[in-house]
Amino acid sequence: YPDFLNMKTNQYERYHIIFLVKEDTSMDESIPKEERKYGRKNLYEMISASNVKYFKKRPLIPKSLLRKKRDCIIVGSACEQGEVYQAILDDVDEDKLEEIASFYDYLEIQPNGNNAFMLRTSDQEYVTNKRGEGKKNRYWKVNSEEDLININKKIIALGDKLGKLVVATGDVHFLSEHDAKFRAIIMASKGFDDADNQPPLYFKTTREMLDDFAWAGDRAREFVIDNPKKIADSIMDNIPPIPPGTFQPHIDGANEELTEKCLNMAKDLYGDPVPEYVANRLQRELDSI
């Protein structure tokens, strides 16, 4: 993979991706260490690396790191900013498209409204950006809702051929439809010209999702209900975001040394033997550390 940390941002590709922790038993001491599952740990290690080691204007995760850390993590192809969708927009050949899609555990399709912004872009292959520079317009061939549906159909065909679950997702960014105005404010502050044209990225009901995928006919239920349920059922129950415990560093003899120092200080202040009420309070404080 390219050394993107020493490259300009327009010299390498970056994509959105979805991670779901499938299983984590890293803190279960009843299981031998070599048999434990480390999904949550792997996820957090990638997040840490993205913010510390691979930060370039934003947190990034190299695919090479993901390959090492994807054990017990389910990887989804994400939205139109995902690698699969972008490859379709770029008209890559079928063999390359299948190679790209095979990397993911499931493929995503999303409502037309999510990607309606493409219909507002130019139908020219190259456009001029704010700096007057020529730039390829990835969306120039997407001119109708039928074009959006055809892209989703291509993803479905890919999933069928590769044996991947195809899941209808909402790319949810906010809870309720009226919350779009808050995202518009955030996007406007970042300089987006179309911030007021917010896509419907709210948490939709099952009926709303079924209506959005009515074009899929009898398979709409498969994409909206059945396949998401299969993904959910494959995930271990009750994985807390933060494992229980304080995880203080272990230093040999630290507990004994701290107790001895505190007790000696108490004797200097209150005499020896230390009064019972002082000793009890000291013990309570030590137990909480």
Language model regions located:
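Extended substrate/RNA-proximal surfaces in nucleic-acid metabolism proteins
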Residues: Y1-K161, F223, E260
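Hydrophobic alpha-helical scaffolding
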Residues: K33-R36, K141-L148, D196-Y202, A214-R221, ...
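Generic recognition of stable, solvent-exposed alpha-helical segments in well-folded globular domains
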Residues: Y38, D95, E99-S102, N150-A157, ...
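Generic, well-ordered alpha-helical scaffold segments in large soluble proteins
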Residues: M46-S50, E99-F103, K154, L158-L162, ...
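Flexible loop/turn segments at secondary-structure boundaries
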Residues: G82-Y85, N114-M118, F174-E177, P240-P241, ...
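Non-catalytic structural connector segments
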Residues: P111, E125-G134, L165-A168, A216-S288
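Active-site glycine-centered loops adjacent to acidic/histidine catalytic or metal-binding residues
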Residues: D171
